[in-house]
Amino acid sequence: MIEGNSGEIILEKNKDTELVPASITKIMTLTLIMEALEEGKIQLTDSVSVSEYAASMGGSQVFLEPNETQTVDTMIKCISIASANDAAVAMAEKIAGSEPNFVKKMNEKAKELGMKHTQFKNCTGLDDDIKSGHFSSAYDVGLMSRELIMKHPGISKYSTVWMDTITHKTKKGESQFGLTNTNKLVRFYDGITGLKTGSTSKAKYCLSATAKRNGLNLIAVVM
């Protein structure tokens, strides 16, 4: 557990153990998206075209189709609320041209933040396996969570939504798709600001939870 304003560690156990992070990987993905927005490289209203590769992602997804377009705003919503792998890859391609190029930026940002026990191989957390070189630690997840929630508090506009819908617009016509937040804390925890859950067969269950009460910002990571 970290205090968000100062970065002080309040409680820790095995904080530097390298583990597979599953979808809390997307905290870094969202951090780079928010940076790109603030730097004016992209706008919330920009269209994002979905590649065949992005549409092919398994795991948690919103079933985007090849050549479908959605706004940056909608893509952030899909990643933050539904942990959508297809939307994450589509945004990685939008910002960096390809997922590998985006992952390079993720690792550069991790180094900048002092994340000494982290290496990313993708922007989703899919197929995370320490043997493949995709890993992080509870403390490192806390560092990137602090970067996202403290420097880009606008993310809570998305991460605190319990349920929402998006509209698919494809050759087949329009259809509604429901989103439900994977972080159940947003339903009942007073002061919750986010942030991200993760779950795979290898990682089991992971959580980075952020909350603010009376000016105190707390970040709790469980892996």
Q: What residue ranges belong to the model's regions?
A:
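Penicillin-recognizing serine hydrolase domain
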Residues: S98-M223
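Active-site-adjacent loops and short helices of periplasmic peptidoglycan-processing enzymes
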Residues: M1-G142, I149-M150
